[in-house]
Structures are given as C-alpha cells and as structure tokens.
Curated annotation (Swiss-Prot):
InterPro entries named in the record: Porin_dom_sf, Porin_Euk, Porin_Euk/Tom40
PROSITE patterns for the chain: EUKARYOTIC_PORIN
Annotated GO MF terms: porin activity; voltage-gated monoatomic anion channel activity
Cellular compartments annotated: Mitochondrion outer membrane
Domain remark text: Consists mainly of membrane-spanning sided beta-sheets.
Protein name: Mitochondrial outer membrane protein porin 5
Gene from which this protein is expressed: VDAC5
Keywords: Ion transport, Membrane, Mitochondrion, Mitochondrion outer membrane, Porin, Transmembrane, Transmembrane beta strand, Transport
Predominant place of localization: mitochondrion
Function recorded in the entry: Forms a channel through the mitochondrial outer membrane that allows diffusion of small hydrophilic molecules. The channel adopts an open conformation at low or zero membrane potential and a closed conformation at potentials above 30-40 mV. The open state has a weak anion selectivity whereas the closed state is cation-selective.
Protein origin, superkingdom: Eukaryota
Family note: Belongs to the eukaryotic mitochondrial porin (TC 1.B.8.1) family.
Any Gene Ontology CC annotation: pore complex
Length: 277
C-alpha cells in the first residue's frame, strides 16, 4: 500500500532530522542480508562498541498483504512485528512485541487519506498507555498533533504539535514538543534540481532552561555511488560522513566526530558495511 496524503505526524521535520543524524555511527558494524528461494529475507548484524560485541539475526517474510519480521539478539530478546496492509481501505495494522518482556507489546492502526492521516497505538498490558496522532493538510502544507495518555495514572505522558511545509526545493517544520517545553525549528534547502547538494539547519530551544542548540549541516552527492555529509552545532561538535555504494545495494559508511572546543579529547570514528544481494 502506497502511503498517500500529508503523512504521519512523525514525518513532519523528518527530512532535516535524517540529514543531520541518519547513518552517522561511531561503532564498527557489519550487516549481511540474503534472500532465500522461498522469499524469506535474512539479515545478520554484528556490532562492536568499545570492547563489547553484539549480534542479531532478523528474518522478514511477506505473504500477500502481510509482513512478518522476527529478530533475535545475543541478549536473548526476541522481537516480532506483524504488519497487515489494507485490513480496511487505506489502513495499516502493526502489532509488535519484544520477549521476554510481555508488557512491551503494542498494537497500532494507521489510516491514510488524501488530506489527512491518523494513527492510534495501544499497549498490550493492563492499564496501557494510549497514543494518538493526526495530521491534516494539502498542497505541501501539513498540520499535526500527538498525545499519549497513561490509563494507569490518568495523566498525559506527552503532547506535541507541529506544522510542516514541503516543496520541491525545500522542507521546513516547526515542532512544539515535550508538553510545550521544547520548540524545534528546522529546514532543508536543495541547491539544485537533482538534489545533489542540500543544506540543513535546526534550532532547538528548551523553554524551562532557556537552552538553545543550533545545528547546521550539508549533503553533497559526488556521484551516483558516493555522498558526503557534515554537521556542526553551537557546542563545537563537528561530524562528517562518507558513504559509498561499493556495489549495487551494498554500502560502506565511514563517519567521525570531534569536539572543536576540546581538541585534547580523542575523536570518535565509526565504520559500517552493509552487504545486500
């Protein structure tokens, strides 16, 4: 099912967030994906973080309008996600649980319309947390709100509101989050029609502490297989990333970060290799 309409609430401001944070890693990570003759996709991921190693194996199988995803890791956790498309017209039903924590289960229903979208999630436990979000808009303009309510305490766990604008050459968003305590303004501007070069900025202000965080960044696609990204915030943290498609669908990512205001501290480096058929 192709998503239509203004998208979910979580999509507002996502372009800026992804450009500033997606694919940056400071660990060593290897991901190998394969597809069996029966159509089952298998993905093994090994991560070295400091002196610790973790490993997880996930399998994905799609049958008609149903998608099953099961992941097992070295901590003996089993995560299962069942996604059913078009249970009702223009809907998506997602059920997830992470064992052995039976209370982690959640059921979410998403509905997509040409001018609106809604999502409701309910925890699978007595007195669960109920979450709701809605977005409405047209012609690249979207308004959204979300809230979470704990039925055990009778209190709201969160409430947020946002407005987003999406045009061919730019994306902008204003988000009021953390129960009204955080204001986040972000924008992405594409410098050319093919979106080979983009710049991004994000300003976050926490009202309770009068704390401001400004992050700027950019993306440049050297060629169809190679891209570089960089970001810098007002605290002096500078990060850069190089991503290269070594063969179709297989990507090597090298990233690093250092504190320009504390050059005596060692920089962080990360390497990730994703191999796909």
């Amino acid at each position: 099912m192709a998503m239509k309409g203004p998208g979910l609430f979580s999509d507002i401001g996502k372009r800026a967030k992804d450009l500033l944070t997606k694919d940056y890693t400071y660990d060593q990570k290897l991901t190998v994906s394969t597809v069996s003759s029966s159509g089952v996709g298998l993905t093994s991921t090994a991560v070295k973080k400091g002196g610790l190693y973790t490993l997880d194996v996930s399998s994905v199988y799609k049958y008609k309008s149903t998608l099953v995803d099961v992941k097992v890791d070295t901590e003996s956790n089993i995560s299962t996600t069942l996604t059913v498309f078009d249970v009702l017209p223009s809907t998506k039903l997602v059920t997830s649980v992470k064992l052995p924590d039976y209370n982690s289960g959640k059921v979410e229903m998403q509905y997509f319309h040409e001018n609106a979208s809604f999502a409701t999630a309910v925890g699978m436990k007595p007195s669960p947390v109920v979450e709701f979000s809605g977005t409405a808009g047209a012609q690249g303009l979207a308004f959204g709100a979300e809230a979470g309510f704990d039925t055990a305490t009778g209190k709201f766990t969160k409430y947020s509101a946002a407005i987003g604008v999406t045009k061919p050459d730019y994306h902008a968003a204003i988000v009021l989050a953390d129960k009204g305590d955080t204001v986040k303004v972000s924008g992405v501007y594409h410098l050319d029609d093919k979106q080979k070069s983009s710049v991004v900025a994000e300003l976050t202000r926490r009202l309770s502490t009068n704390e401001n965080t400004l992050t700027v960044g950019g993306l440049y696609k050297v060629d169809p297989e190679t891209a570089v990204k960089a970001r810098l915030n007002n605290t002096g943290k500078l990060a850069a990333l190089l991503q290269h498609e070594v063969k179709p669908k297989s990507v090597l990512t090298i990233s690093g970060e250092f504190d320009t205001k504390a050059l005596d501290r060692p920089p962080k480096f990360g390497l990730a290799l994703a191999l796909r058929p």
